[in-house]
Amino acid sequence: KLTYDVAKTSTHGSDELAQIITDAYEQAGEFGVVSHERSYTDETYIKKVEGHPVEAGFTNEMYINNPTYQTCEFDNPMVLLSMNQIKDYNQIAPFIAKAFENNKRTPVVLFSEIDHHVENIILHNVSEFKFPICVVRLPAIGILQREIMNDLSLLFNCEILPSVPTVDFQGMEEKYIGNCKSIKIGANDVSFLKHDNFENDKVTGKINELNSQIKVNDSETEKIYLKKRVARLTGGIA
């Protein structure tokens, strides 16, 4: 009722807009984020992002496997996170081999900057052998990028690949392999769902930490950014 009353006042007494805003907050949940954008139709509507949103996208349209929606979609993929440019295919070869272990064809999603020679090898495998893989460009830059990637490492339950390109991953691949129930990758947005039985106390701890920072922060810009991080971790955004 309070949300509706505030929304009605903000929209100059519009019952319709007040109800839409109220519904959006209910759908986003306690820790979710509600934002607004210009509609390209005459309709005002709610668009809820299912799962955990990331402001990123595929690096090449050849990764698209759902032409209707122009997205790349995988169930139960192997996820790799790297803060550094992949300059040699051998840096990811052990994980590609892992994806094909025991005659499996596990989809691979790689969040990383990648040398064009390495990506050409990957795209050849996609084109010639229908290898299920997608390279996703890193979100944001600088400190913001590191914070987002650290959040993703909690949600995918894996470590970020080290910066040393000569590291031998043989026998220690598991700790760098993340996973999720499903993922949808577009040109400019990514969303994924965690497994139903996912539990990670570190995620809860990070959410509590961010909410504490929101309460004491005086900067509205910083608060918005922190709330987006909370929304990503909780999976609530409308």
Language-model features, listed with the residues they occupy:
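Long, structured protein-protein interaction/assembly regions in large complexes
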Residues: 1-238
